[in-house]
């Protein structure tokens, strides 16, 4: 049997930016980190790793396609992942879609390459991990799972990402901490509160040093 191989030419990317941002008190996609919004940080990183890039949000964002939830207000990040799958399935040559969260501006520059390298067959899912914790929102998903995910969202009341993963073959990819001038940074550090934003500014400066 030929070894399965997946590269950038078959991968689309979607930034999940449809959350309510209650602890931040405002839409996180538009929050400024340095001179750019969190959404722009995510798009810049993702566009270097995927053939097509879009944003899962409720309204127009930046200069990329917007992919709204088909289950608004009901399924949390799973609705965004489903929307990403549906969007990617309509693109020529695309077999997989990678999802990232808008509130994690430092996610790895080799996220997609390492997730893709870990996949052993077309229907397998790859998710990221660091520091012993999985980050299922950062996942590489076969677009063929869209119908199954849609049915699962419609019937499962909890709709947690981890519960859906239990239905499928999943591989987890551990990413190392990133060295900076200050200390080691978890690349999946996320910004949920104003205090987190202050910390992110410090990390941004440390990375630039």
UniProtKB/Swiss-Prot annotation:
Lineage of origin: Bacteria, Pseudomonadati, Pseudomonadota, Alphaproteobacteria, Hyphomicrobiales
Alphabetized GO MF terms: GTP binding; metal ion binding; molybdenum cofactor guanylyltransferase activity
Any one annotated GO CC term: cytoplasm
Keyword GTP-binding: yes
Entry keyword annotation includes Cytoplasm: yes
Subcellular location: Cytoplasm
Quaternary structure and interacting proteins, as annotated: Monomer.
Annotated positions binding Mg(2+): 103
Family listed: Belongs to the MobA family.
Biological role stated in the UniProt entry: Transfers a GMP moiety from GTP to Mo-molybdopterin (Mo-MPT) cofactor (Moco or molybdenum cofactor) to form Mo-molybdopterin guanine dinucleotide (Mo-MGD) cofactor.
InterPro entries the record matches: MobA-like_NTP_Trfase, Molybde_CF_guanTrfase, Nucleotide-diphossugar_trans
Listed EC numbers: 2.7.7.77
Alphabetically ordered keywords of this record: Cytoplasm, GTP-binding, Magnesium, Metal-binding, Molybdenum cofactor biosynthesis, Nucleotide-binding, Transferase
Residues that coordinate or bind GTP: 16-18, 28, 56, 69, 103
Protein name: Molybdenum cofactor guanylyltransferase
């Amino acid at each position: 049997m030929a070894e399965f191989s997946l590269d950038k030419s078959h991968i689309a990317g979607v930034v999940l930016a449809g959350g309510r941002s209650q602890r931040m008190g405002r839409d996180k996609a538009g929050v400024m980190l340095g001179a750019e919004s969190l959404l722009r940080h995510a798009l810049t990183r993702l566009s270097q790793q995927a053939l097509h890039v879009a944003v899962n949000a409720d309204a127009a964002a930046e200069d990329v396609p917007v992919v709204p939830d088909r289950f608004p207000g009901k399924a949390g990040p799973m609705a965004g992942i489903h929307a990403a799958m549906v969007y990617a399935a309509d693109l020529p040559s695309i077999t997989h879609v990678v999802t990232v969260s808008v509130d994690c501006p430092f996610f790895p520059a080799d996220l997609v390459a390492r997730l893709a390298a870990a996949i052993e067959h077309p229907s397998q899912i790859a998710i990221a991990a660091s520091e012993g914790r999985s980050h299922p929102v950062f996942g590489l998903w076969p677009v063929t799972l869209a119908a199954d995910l849609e049915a699962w969202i419609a019937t499962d009341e909890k709709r947690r990402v981890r519960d859906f993963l239990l239905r499928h073959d999943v591989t987890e990819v551990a990413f190392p901490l990133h060295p900076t001038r200050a200390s080691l940074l978890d690349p999946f550090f996320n910004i949920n509160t104003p205090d987190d934003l202050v910390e992110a500014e410090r990390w941004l400066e440390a990375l630039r040093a």
